[in-house]
A protein has these predicted regions:
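Active-site proximal loop and beta-alpha junction motif in alpha/beta enzyme cores
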Residues: 1-126, 138-185
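Helical hairpin unit composed of two closely spaced alpha helices linked by a short loop
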Residues: 131-133
Length: 185
């Protein structure tokens, strides 16, 4: 590809992408969705303050939203203190989430940096997840825990998430080649 900008079609939307610098790509991820029935949640409730009971332990102040797929984020002191191999599938499949949900435990490092531990819906524990980075950044910004330009650190690498005044989300991160393939058109 010699183009600096392309459109990427996902299963539910079209994303604008552009090459930035030597090895970064920026995606326009659109706006987050907060309406309870579009996240979706089973019932109408405050999506910014969800409490879940998992095996007798309460997880409070969960923030649920949709950024192309559903997410719930819990802000905690240490995101690796919780065993997502056990908690992840229980929260993902909780009755509150009719389409299941991605699960993120996030710790605020400072007003521009967050470290996360992510359970990806249908995939399990993951080393990185773009939509989880976007959802976490939006939730932290709305809760006034961070600014609107945030670095999200995963086990493997990091992504930069920016939001404009209308909450349009821009995700930027490095690209690495996993496999090279040719296709004749």
């Amino acid at each position: 590809l010699n183009n600096k900008e392309i459109k990427l079609k996902t299963n539910n939307r079209l994303l604008n992408a552009k090459i930035v610098g030597e090895s970064d790509v920026q995606l326009e991820m659109g706006k987050p969705v907060f309406e309870w029935n579009k996240i979706p949640l089973k019932e109408k409730l405050d999506h910014k303050n969800i409490t879940l009971d998992i095996d007798g332990k309460e997880f409070t102040y969960g923030f649920s939203l949709n950024v192309g797929n559903p997410h719930i984020i819990f802000f905690v002191k240490d995101c690796f203190e919780y065993d997502l191999k056990i908690l992840g599938p229980k929260i993902e499949n909780h009755e509150l989430f009719p389409d299941r949900t991605n699960v993120t435990f996030a710790q605020i490092d400072d007003e521009n940096n967050i470290t996360v531990n992510v359970w990806e819906r249908g995939a399990g524990l993951t080393k990185a997840c773009g939509t989880a980075a976007c959802a976490t950044a939006v939730a932290a910004f709305i809760k006034k825990l961070t600014k609107n330009d945030i670095n999200i650190k995963f086990e493997e690498g990091s992504l930069n998430i920016k939001m404009d005044a209308d909450l349009n989300i821009f995700m930027r991160g490095p690209v690495s080649e996993i496999k090279h393939t040719s296709l004749e058109i």
